[in-house]
């Protein structure tokens, strides 16, 4: 069996890529919500036509990415500010009908008991 592939990334580039920024986080989050609400409004306006179905499918796919956002916000890795991470996490949890405090601690428990049968809540 061959050893797993490990990408060689320049340490300076890696440091630059993982830096947190409130401005970049707000920009990316803002674009996400702008597109989400724009496609949502468009799908609502197309209700009753055949165009509703493909547009709503696009909306559902975009909405599904809120799960990835919730995961990264759980790790406080989107914004530099903890307050912005927490606020955005609450917003995303509200959108997906999840309780934010339970969600955060459940995910933390997952990382402390990863793949332990009966103890990993996400396993």
Located regions from the model:
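Loop-to-helix transition at the N-terminal end of transmembrane alpha-helices
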Residues: 50-61
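Short acidic/polar alpha-helix capping motifs at helix-coil junctions
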Residues: 3-5, 55-56, 70-72
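Membrane-embedded catalytic scaffold of the fatty acid hydroxylase/desaturase
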Residues: 63-70, 74-123
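Short hydrophobic "helix-edge" motifs at membrane interfaces and signal-peptide entry regions
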Residues: 22-23, 60-62
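Topogenic membrane-insertion module of multi-pass membrane proteins
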Residues: 1-52
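Aromatic-acidic/polar surface patches that form glycan- and anion
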Residues: 31, 59, 96
